[in-house]
Amino acid sequence: MQKIKVLCVDDSALIRSLMTEIINSQPDMTVVATAPDPLVARELIKQHNPDVLTLDVEMPRMDGLDFLEKLMRLRPMPVVMVSSLTERGSEITLRALELGAVDFVTKPRVGIRDGMLDYAEKLADKIRAASRARVRQAPQPQAAARSADSAAAAPMINNPLVSTEKLIIIGASTGGTEAIREVLTPLPPDAPAVLIAQHMPPGFTKSFAQRLNGLCRIAVKEAEHGERVLPGHAYIAPGHAHLLLARSGANYIAQLSDEPPVNRHRPSVDVLFRSAATHAGKNAIGVILTGMGRDGAAGLLEMKRAGAHTFAQDEASCIVFGMPREAIALGGADEVAPLADMSRRVMARLATMGDRVQRV
């Protein structure tokens, strides 16, 4: 079996050494070269033709974002960003995902062995997924402007969807930040409440919510424990907790849980979907988007069995066709839709629900 060829780009010799040690310990991948900055990396890419690039966010001579933008325009390839757990680091990482990076990992903590096995497993999984990922070219400025214009001009649904009884429940992983943006930006201000579980570490989900809030016509925020779930709002699971839907009388509320990871994830899509199956039933729409693994597949099936209408993103538009594929294989998806049409299909389905609000 041919090994996945990886090029590691980081200005820290210690980080380059640690990443090399982790990657070379895997049976199916190898580091073909390392580079201290993007200018050296540019020549090594020509020489080694790597399958995956790991790229530090902030470096001398040329920062990671500038290099990524040029790379995705001139020679698109799978890139996994390596980021620090800081507010600035999370904002830059989200911008990198917009520019076409497949995924990101936090920097390994040099000299601290606790948690290193878990980190190594996550890094290897992300590199494997990236090697199979569908790579997007960097968006042109005109395309971004058209996207914003189309979101502003998205048609309103004739029947205002203001009932808290209707909910959109979304789960995603690898490639999900951009997929979620594409689903949320066309939603009208009176759309039903949206609850989202996106696999992200602590510290990144708040920046993700803030970025979406500036792009969407609905309000987007990081979910808080016990808050009421309202129409026209989207609630993103914090990176350290499971997000669950619950009821308080006639109202829906968000609950956060620090229970152990499910499917190796916290937040877990399955946890969110199962809570929606229990407390929303026929009043919910379930959507599973791009991502590796199977988290959310069983939960989407539970939502469907509880009466919810369910969607899975199609293979052609997924960065990684893992979670949707598993959901489809289990029979959990009522419809399979391309990402570009997902928001319209969801809103059209909600419009057909009319006043058929079911109490559960």
From Swiss-Prot:
Residues 161-353 form the CheB-type methylesterase domain. It comes from Burkholderia orbicola (strain AU 1054). Belongs to the CheB family. The lineage of its organism: Bacteria, Pseudomonadati, Pseudomonadota, Betaproteobacteria, Burkholderiales. The gene is cheB1. It is an enzyme of class 3 (hydrolase). The modification 4-aspartylphosphate is found at residue 56. GO terms for cellular component: cytoplasm. Gene3D superfamilies: 3.40.50.2300, Methylesterase CheB, C-terminal domain. Contains a C-terminal catalytic domain, and an N-terminal region which modulates catalytic activity. This is Protein-glutamate methylesterase/protein-glutamine glutaminase 1. The active site is at 173, 199, 295. CDD domains: CheB_Rec (cd16432), REC_CheB-like (cd17541). GO terms for molecular function: phosphorelay response regulator activity; protein-glutamate methylesterase activity; protein-glutamine glutaminase activity. Keywords: Chemotaxis, Cytoplasm, Hydrolase, Phosphoprotein. It is found in: Cytoplasm. Pfam families: CheB_methylest, Response_reg.
